[in-house]
Amino acid sequence: MRIGLVEFLLILAIASLTVGPQVALFVDRWMRRANRANARAARRRAEYAAQMAAERDALLKRFRTASTVFGVGILLALVYALVFRPIDTPPQAYTAPEVRQSTGAVQTALSADSRDVLALGDYQGVDCIREQDGFVYAAAYNGATLKKRKSDLVRTDGGSFSAILSVDGELTGFAFDADGDLWLTVLTPGGGALCRARHDSWGAAVEQVVTQIDGAPLGAVSAVEAGPDGKVYFAVAGGEAVDNGLEAALRTELLAHTGTGWVYVYDPADRSVQRVVGGVAGASGLALSPDGRTLSVSDLGNRCVWSMDADARELTAGGKNCQSAFSGLPGYPGALAMEADGTLYISYRWTRSGWLEKNADSTLLRGIALRAGQNLQEKLFGLPSDAPCAEAVSTADGSWKRTFTGGSSCTAVCPVGSKVYFGAADSAQVLSARI
């Protein structure tokens, strides 16, 4: 039997009327079940997201709290390290020295001619220069070795150079006495020493003569001068630690201004040591008058040169019988040298620091600078190329003869005939100027 279109449509209508409600009910139940499952899943996702957000907020809160505590701890540690941490040389308040007016002296630039420069090869950091028997001698350390661990006395005639003797430590100064013996000031991390090398044993042995004063190790020895009577004068910059060498000790004294520098005299005849003058804020240079009767001492912190009778004992800088011969200097004086005509040469390690002297009465700020470390302290002091690196003055009438420029951190000065030789920090050359 064939089913026509009408019959087929009737069958579909009867089936839909019979099964349709059940199918619709089934689909409705299935859709409701699916909607409820989706709703439960959505609620679970929302609860999970809320839980994650809460945990994240709690973690961030704990992190912020820990960061705050850590930051406060770091800040407190920094405040302690810069303000309250005990230091060996607490700063002392002082009155900043006046600034001298222009002297009108002749301006002389250090020579740029290579013929006026004494090359020292690998040697660097010239700390002292002397002339003897037509040769120029320089105290320097070998740049090929660890800095300041081993120093040599180098002799040059302008064409060649050779090491005369070597010492362990920093050779901060040397001087020849009337007998030709060599007197040295040597600084090591263990302390300073005054040493002697006899003229017939150079290169063989260096004898330590003075290593202690009143049972305490000698401090930062900075200069030595031999008198015509055989007595030997030597300076101790101050009571600072000597672990990092003379330059670091001088910077520390500039910032602390403890006034603990001393000048001593050693008499080889009876091997006695006596105090000449104390209360110096960085005794960094010595010079004797041509007749050996007057002693000049450079005072770093007070920017002056003290003058006194070489036979005087137990003086105080600025006190009775020890007055400032030249004050208000434009820089912090270091090495001194005296010519036969009484002309005194004053070298400057650094130019005057306006920040330091502005805070002369502030022990807080200078204490922070002392605690901040050596790298920061080095940035506080410098010597621009246009600033005086040395000056020449007549000790007879006090007239300023010449101002030298073009150097950097002048550590040594030595007049020889028509030239003046200069040593500069970390320089591999002995510089000079024609006069």
Give names to the regions the model predicted.
Residues V117-D122, A163-D168, V209-A216, R275-A281, ...:
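Surface loop/turn motifs at the tips and blade-to-blade linkers of beta-strand repeat domains
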Residues R115-S151, S408-A412:
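Beta-strand-rich domains and repeat architectures in extracellular enzymes and scaffolds
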Residues A93-G125, A396-R402:
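A short helix->beta-strand "capping" segment at the edge of beta-propeller domains
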Residues T185-G227, F234-R251:
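Asp-box/WD-like beta-propeller blade repeats and closely related beta-sheet repeat scaffolds
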Residues N142-G143, K148-G192, V210-I213:
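Blade-loop segments of beta-propeller domains
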Residues E131-G134, F176-D179, A226-D229, P290-G292, ...:
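Residue-level detector of Asp-centered blade-edge/turn motifs that repeat once per structural unit
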Residues Q92, Y141-K148, F234-T258, R349-P384:
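Short, conserved, GDST-rich strand-edge loop motifs in beta-rich repeat architectures
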Residues A138-A139, W183-T185, Y233-A235, V297-S298, ...:
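Residue position within the beta-strands of beta-propeller blades
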